[in-house]
């Protein structure tokens, strides 16, 4: 039976309860996505050795660098669809759906070509260790072959989030996650395929999740219905998606560029530190995605309320999302830091790898709530229609600062501790500037109650 699209009203009722109910399936979905990579890392680390573990883990920053621009565009699709839905503009919702899915497929094919043919060169630019680069290149090439399906899932699930539906994408990912884990074990243990096996398992599972979520849109009877026979770009919808999504994507891309520079600095310490950093980064990802669910809630709730002209709800959305992100960061980040040694042993039995991972986790996990606050405030600005502003603030406050830190402080004190401290320092400064910008925007909106959302 088709889903009634008019069930995702995020503009009325108990806001905190709605935010939590919206965010929990979203957090679970993001965690399942992380489990794809975690399953790769754990199986490879346990059954293929530390070199294979470093090969898989060292690709994360580079993958994010190439992918995040287009993931930002899916955020634009989410904002535009949510605004149209809040304004009860059915034609606008439908045009956004057709445009978004088309954009997702085109983006995926572009990424597949670039990622496949440039893999080795990009890894060499990152100073990937010689004993790792061959396996890293193989993993990266196979991974990017599946990029059209990854982008299709991102854009399709963004459209479902726009109308408050976060539960059905969770089910799709749960099915795909089980497939991924089973295939990892089969390919690596039974067929001894090492990194090629985990990459192949990942793209098969991502294809399953993409097809399932897209099928949900096809079965819709309301404005969210996807007509596969009439895919294409609608100029108005595409323009709005690009206006919101490009700044967000550029911000994420430059963030990833700074992380690539940091990964290159990590690579300078050798494959043991690379392996420990990879395992720690994967664990930290679970904390981040749990917090980031509330940032995604902030942009969707803010966008719908802007579309419905319920400006009185905007402050409540911001306060509730900040509260949830802070509590999540404190509980999960603190817990991960305290249990870091035990958790890292899931990834590697090598004590020196575990020690290297702990050095990162004790700094990042204990301060991760700052990152959660930064993301929620940026999402509130985007939902209000200001996408360039948080991009500029983040690029200067986080990315540029990290690059300067590595070129100065890290060069003087060449230790992993000094390298990892660049994260919390950048989060503090960026959060403070985002807050100041949001207060200014809030004041402008109060003085212009008839503010246009176009």
Where are these regions (language model features)?
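Alpha-helical transmembrane segments of multi-pass membrane transport proteins
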Residues: 17, 32-33, 70-71, 111, ...
């Amino acid at each position: 039976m088709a889903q009634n699209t008019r069930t995702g009203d995020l503009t009325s009722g108990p806001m905190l309860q709605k935010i939590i109910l919206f965010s929990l399936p979203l957090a679970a979905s993001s965690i399942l996505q992380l489990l794809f990579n975690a399953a790769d890392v754990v199986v490879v680390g346990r059954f293929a050795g530390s070199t294979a573990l470093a090969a898989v883990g060292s690709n994360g920053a580079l993958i994010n660098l190439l992918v995040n621009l287009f993931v930002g565009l899916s955020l634009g699709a989410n904002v535009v669809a949510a605004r149209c839905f809040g304004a009860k503009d059915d034609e606008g919702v439908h045009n956004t759906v057709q445009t978004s899915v088309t954009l997702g497929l085109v983006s995926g094919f572009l990424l597949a070509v670039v990622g496949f043919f440039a893999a080795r060169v990009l890894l060499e630019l990152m100073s990937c260790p010689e004993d790792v680069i061959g396996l890293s290149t193989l993993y990266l090439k196979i991974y990017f072959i599946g990029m059209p399906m990854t982008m299709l899932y991102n854009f399709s699930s963004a459209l479902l989030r726009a109308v408050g539906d976060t539960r059905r994408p969770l089910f799709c990912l749960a099915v795909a996650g089980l497939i991924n884990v089973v295939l990892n074990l089969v390919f690596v243990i039974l067929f001894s395929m090492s990194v090629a096996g985990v990459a192949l398992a990942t793209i098969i599972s991502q294809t399953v999740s993409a097809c399932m979520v897209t099928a949900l849109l096809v079965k819709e009877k309301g404005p969210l219905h996807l007509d596969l026979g009439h895919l294409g770009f609608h100029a108005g919808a595409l323009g709005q998606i690009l206006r919101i999504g490009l700044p967000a994507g550029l911000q994420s891309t430059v963030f990833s560029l700074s992380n690539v520079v940091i990964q290159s600095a990590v690579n300078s310490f050798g494959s043991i530190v690379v392996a420990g950093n990879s395992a720690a980064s994967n664990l930290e990802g679970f904390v981040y995605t749990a917090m980031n669910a509330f940032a995604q809630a902030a942009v969707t709730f803010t966008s719908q309320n802007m579309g419905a002209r319920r400006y009185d709800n905007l402050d409540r959305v911001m306060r509730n999302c900040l509260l949830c992100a802070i509590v999540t960061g404190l509980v999960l980040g603190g817990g991960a830091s305290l249990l870091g040694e035990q958790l890292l042993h899931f990834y590697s039995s090598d004590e020196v790898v575990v020690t290297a991972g702990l050095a990162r986790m004790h700094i990042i996990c204990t301060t991760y709530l700052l990152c959660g606050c930064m993301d929620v405030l940026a999402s509130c600005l985007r939902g209000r229609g200001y996408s360039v502003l948080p991009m500029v603030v983040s690029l200067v406050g986080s990315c540029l600062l990290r690059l300067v830190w590595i070129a100065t402080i890290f060069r003087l004190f060449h230790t992993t501790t000094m390298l990892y401290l660049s994260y919390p320092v950048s989060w503090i400064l960026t959060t403070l500037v985002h807050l100041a910008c949001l207060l200014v925007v809030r004041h402008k909106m109060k003085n212009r109650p008839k503010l246009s959302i176009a």
